[in-house]
């Protein structure tokens, strides 16, 4: 029986990744390096013989443009795609736009690590009159006030990502379609925690590098049997370590 595969990709480096700022739902674009990473991810997938029947991404352009670049390399720019806010990055509340290292200098490395990677820890909330509140953005006009976050923990991110997985993505995989998901560090961490049944301590230490394809293989019951990155292992480990170090004081 053929192995069922799923490809997950965190967006390439964004302009605010480059500036080491908390991004969350702020709609910042890819940096030049990020576009290069996305094209390289597409080339890797092409060289490994991947092709897709359907794509999912968020409503934030750093993920959308990553997907565009990947599909362009695969000559699949036409691929049917669904965009959902449920695949957005976690909302970083009042931290959005702040420099991570400067925030660590102010509050300490451990507090920032908990805000960035803790399971149930929420960053300080936005107020609804803050220009960063998603209720001011027309792309979220169909959401209820209860669905619009003022801040999110990873646990709250899981609460929106996993129902979307169960109701939208998994049924498509079960039907035999080959699926790629281009999303964000924390929406993908939410999915990895669920698929691999990771503990809160394990997920705290999981950092997903930008622009690197992460492949899941499933058994006939659609349970994960293997998870691996495509690319040079040393380079990927260095990129993941760099992600972890973003939240430390200089």
Swiss-Prot record:
It comes from the Bacteria. GO terms for molecular function: phosphoglycerate mutase activity. GO terms for biological process: gluconeogenesis; glycolytic process. Pathway: Carbohydrate degradation; glycolysis; pyruvate from D-glyceraldehyde 3-phosphate: step 3/5. Keywords: Gluconeogenesis, Glycolysis, Isomerase. The active site is at residues 11, 89. Coiled coil: none annotated. Its EC number is 5.4.2.11. The keyword rRNA-binding does not apply. CDD domains: HP_PGM_like. It catalyses: (2R)-2-phosphoglycerate = (2R)-3-phosphoglycerate. PANTHER family: PHOSPHOGLYCERATE MUTASE. Belongs to the phosphoglycerate mutase family. BPG-dependent PGAM subfamily. Homodimer. Catalyzes the interconversion of 2-phosphoglycerate and 3-phosphoglycerate. This is 2,3-bisphosphoglycerate-dependent phosphoglycerate mutase. It comes from Serratia proteamaculans (strain 568). The lineage of its organism: Bacteria, Pseudomonadati, Pseudomonadota, Gammaproteobacteria, Enterobacterales.
